[in-house]
């Protein structure tokens, strides 16, 4: 990886692509690296520059100019922090969360009776993600306010997985109330120092001001083809704008407004599907060899 060379490393080779990551992120994904890299290096993720910096343990020197420093603990080879605080019922409630740099959501909260917060009044059912054991289902809602360190964030889109299915699929015995993912972390430059037990968060001011939004179309897309630029509807949520537009699983998207689908990547398509409540999206669709137009009216569902 770059100039990095490592011998005698343990690797896991999966014969079948269970996660189908390439299809859902729209770029070729050949593997995942985890604990061994993070444990042997100080890892800095610069989301705005799309850069990953590995610094040898002992060579990284923390300075306040690099951001705010927060303790982390490593359990079951995973990093956890107590730097997250929720606001509910007029009180601040610190929680322990997993720092999940491989997750696309902002915040995931365990949905079980023993937790100190309730499911929001307004939620939608959704497929929250995928693991080696299958699809993770649950609810999506909004948390009014939370803090990550000293930074306050409002109206965060949060995932609430079905407790039984989520616990079985995660398979971790570590006590935690949820996890934070890249939709939240991308608003910072993040440095993970497993060796000395801390993380550093340097805010990206423009990204901190961005609102938390969720897909307003109600459809999930997968990419296919050698260049991963052929886009198909993978799932349509009931009573969603996509369902109202007559879209079905297996439909191929040829044009999205004035854009040929082949000119867009997955992230750009989802950004178009977050353009605003009431916005119309014109689609050219192919189904079973037939081509037709349809209009999709975006709706903020949470």
Which stretches of residues belong to each language-model region?
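Pepsin/retropepsin-fold aspartyl endopeptidases
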Residues: 1-302
């Amino acid at each position: 990886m770059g100039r990095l060379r490592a011998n005698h490393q343990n690797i896991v080779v999966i014969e079948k692509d269970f996660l189908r990551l390439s299809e859902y992120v729209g770029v070729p994904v050949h593997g995942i690296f985890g604990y061994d890299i993070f444990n042997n290096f100080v890892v800095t993720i610069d989301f705005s520059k799309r850069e990953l910096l590995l610094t040898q343990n002992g060579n990284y020197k923390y300075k306040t100019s690099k951001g705010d420093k927060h303790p982390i603990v490593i359990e079951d080879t995973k990093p956890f922090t107590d730097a997250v605080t929720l606001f509910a019922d007029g009180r601040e409630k610190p929680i322990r969360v997993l720092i999940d740099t491989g997750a696309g959501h902002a915040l995931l909260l365990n949905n079980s009776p023993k937790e100190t917060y309730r499911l929001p009044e307004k939620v939608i059912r959704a497929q929250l993600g995928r693991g080696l054991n299958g699809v993770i289902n649950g609810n999506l809602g909004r948390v009014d306010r939370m803090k990550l360190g000293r930074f306050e964030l409002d109206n965060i889109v949060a995932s609430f997985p079905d407790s039984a299915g989520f616990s079985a699929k995660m398979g971790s015995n570590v006590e935690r109330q949820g996890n934070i993912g890249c939709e939240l972390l991308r608003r910072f430059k993040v440095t993970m120092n497993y060796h000395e037990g801390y993380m550093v968060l340097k805010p990206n001011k423009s990204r901190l001001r961005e609102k938390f939004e969720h897909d307003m179309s109600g459809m999930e897309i997968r990419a296919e083809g050698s260049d991963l630029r052929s886009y198909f509807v993978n799932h349509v949520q009931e009573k969603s704008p996509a369902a109202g537009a007559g879209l079905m699983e297996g439909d191929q998207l040829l044009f999205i407004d004035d854009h040929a689908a082949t000119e867009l990547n997955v992230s750009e398509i989802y950004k178009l599907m977050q353009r605003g409540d009431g916005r119309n999206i014109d689609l050219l669709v192919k189904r079973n060899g037939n081509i037709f137009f349809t209009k999709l009216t975006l709706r903020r569902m949470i």
